[in-house]
């Protein structure tokens, strides 16, 4: 009770206008954080795509005549993973963004079957760095807030190593 009385004496009375102003500050800061996290996800996907030296970025799905990216992001929607654009991602329970970075693998753009391999990624911010976490902590690194493509090269190599390791599991014994 004493703390509340002291606060009221020091700060006068807090009005609904004060609460609205603070709420606007919170919403603005969350929007800025979300934009930064999404930019990391976009750059990570693009850097992975570039590092794969793909003969082409897309393949044509004969069932739908739709062009499909070889490298893309998946996010959980209604309990299942669906292809999503990073701008559609929302915060997870710890104010980060979680998604799967997926690669479709085939012999040629017109060949089937195609295999999709995905690596779970979580990006959040701690102070002056972004933290990139792969496979719930199997690999973690940080990059500066002002990042460039080279900051993602090690992460992309680890993602490719995870995919190769997962593909090994498909070889019959």
Language-model region placement:
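Glycine-rich, aromatic-bearing surface loops/beta-hairpins
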Residues: 117-173
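Charge-rich, low-complexity N-terminal segments
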Residues: 2-71
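Generic, low-specificity signal for short hydrophobic/alpha-helical stretches with a mild N-terminal bias
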Residues: 23-26, 30, 81-83, 87, ...
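Amphipathic, interaction-prone secondary-structure segments
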Residues: 60-121
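Non-membrane alpha-helical secondary structure
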Residues: 8-11, 29, 93, 147, ...
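Residue-level signal for well-ordered alpha-helical segments
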Residues: 14-21, 25, 76-82, 136, ...
């Amino acid at each position: 009770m004493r703390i509340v009385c002291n606060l009221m004496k020091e700060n006068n009375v807090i009005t609904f206008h004060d609460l609205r102003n603070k709420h606007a500050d919170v919403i603005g800061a969350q929007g800025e954080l979300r934009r930064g996290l999404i930019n990391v996800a976009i750059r990570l996907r693009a850097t992975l795509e570039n590092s794969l030296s793909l003969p082409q970025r897309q393949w044509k799905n004969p069932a739908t005549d739709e062009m499909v990216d070889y490298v893309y992001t998946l996010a959980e929607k209604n309990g299942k993973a669906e292809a999503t654009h990073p701008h559609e991602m929302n915060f997870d329970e710890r104010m980060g963004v979680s998604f799967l970075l997926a690669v479709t693998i085939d012999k040629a753009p017109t060949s089937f079957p195609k295999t999709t391999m995905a690596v779970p990624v979580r990006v959040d911010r701690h102070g002056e760095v972004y933290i990139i976490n792969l496979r719930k902590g199997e690999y973690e690194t940080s990059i500066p807030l002002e990042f460039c493509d080279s900051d993602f090269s090690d992460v992309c190599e680890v993602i490719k190593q995870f995919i190769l390791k997962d593909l090994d599991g498909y070889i019959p014994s």
